[in-house]
């Protein structure tokens, strides 16, 4: 899937720190989810970095730490500071610096915020940033990001028993694939992706509720017939 003709030429970048990567992810996310408060103040940006939901890993950083990271990102032109407000506000410049379209920015943002994801998880979790028609369109953009001269994502080894490969961003440097292969192997053949695990839990609850309903029905019918279903059967 080719980028549009007016996509800016990408620049070579140094590896980012985890906090710098988190800041970029938060700025893109909030640009789409709370546009009325974007660009973000330092307070809002710090709160977004420390958010407990939709974050992996969860961070606990101070405004001073965020300010230091912002200064570095401004030097890389990845973040710009607005001057039209008494309160300093910050916005990202990822599209222009990285030279990638908004669809790819959406996918990269989810990886920056949530860690490794399958293409299916990326499609689901990026819905508020961009609506992808299907998983194949997600994979097409991921393949482009992985094929760049300076790759931005990588496909991780498939975990035993998993149906899909996960993807991870490379904004913080290269990934030791052996670490992921050994970690995945340690999960065993019974390991499943988070999305499948949640579906299995929901199905287990549904079945448990159904069993409880049927048990109540049996008890009611037995009571009407005068049968003691709890009595032990005759030994013969």
From Swiss-Prot:
SUPFAM superfamilies: Winged helix' DNA-binding domain. Gene3D superfamilies: Winged helix-like DNA-binding domain superfamily/Winged helix DNA-binding domain. It comes from the Bacteria. InterPro entries: DUF480, WH-like_DNA-bd_sf, WH_DNA-bd_sf. Belongs to the UPF0502 family. PANTHER family: UPF0502 PROTEIN YCEH. This is UPF0502 protein Bcenmc03_4618.
